[in-house]
Amino acid sequence: TWMMYQMTIENKLCLHSSANRNKGSYLDLSTDNVTLFFGMSGTGKTTLSSDPERILIGDDEHVWTDRGVFNIEGGCYAKCIDLKECHEPDIFRAVRYGSVLENVVVKGLENTPEFSDDSITKNTRCSYPLSYIPNSACSGEFAGLGGHPNQIVFLTCDAQGLLPPISLLSPNDAVDFFLAGYTSKMAGTEMGVTEPVTTFSACFGEPFLIWHPEKYGSLLKEKITRHNTPVWLVNTGWSKWNGGVRIPLRYTRQMIKFINNYTSDK
């Protein structure tokens, strides 16, 4: 909350976002291919930024300055419901000694987590340090740092099936969508939410904002214009293009891979 206040005064953009970068040189941030993921709980920020093929900068809060982006948190807070190693290998392997499980049912003498058990709540979570992710920027001179974003991804979980799976936004449309923050509250993300509910959360982080959303929107437009940063909208929810079912994670991962390669190949 303090960073949302202070960084804005310093003309730095504090964001509710995750970030990763390519496996390029640690010693030259100018060679980085950095992706920022914006989105509310349940839209896929943690899952998609924890990519075995890329380096995780941070999970939830970043600041975009005149020199690039930096992470302001030292760990991750991942949803665990129906967690499977085949779908989310890095997060699955991070659930080990030293991590903290929340609302997760454990069984047997070895306290084995039962990730499919939602008898307490669907909002099962795990907190773990960044160092538990093998490909994370958690140590060294450039720990938690990245260059200017090469691409930004707005993650929205559209429960109405109105949005396409992927689209490229103009700068003006990007700012408008950023200010609107259209998404859905997912089951288990808040007390009493048992099915997807359409909602709007300004800047994809309304609970954390201190200033009027337009301050953050103005800073975002300034930065994406200055650095020619493309902004993509990715729907991780439901789509009529997919037969009215939720878009599978494997499809979304391929979209993110396309976005990263699209920018690199331009």
Regions found by a protein language model. Name each.
Residues H16-S18, N22-G39, D51-P52, V63-K266:
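Glycine-rich, often acidic-flanked micro-motifs
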Residues L56-I57:
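Cys/His-rich finger/ribbon microdomains and the adjacent scaffold used
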Residues L48:
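Hydrophobic positions on the alpha1 helix immediately C-terminal to the Walker A/P-loop
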Residues T1-G24:
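N-terminal pre-Walker A segment at the start of P-loop NTPase domains
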Residues K45:
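Conserved lysine of the Walker
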Residues G42:
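Walker A (P-loop) phosphate-binding loop of P-loop NTPases
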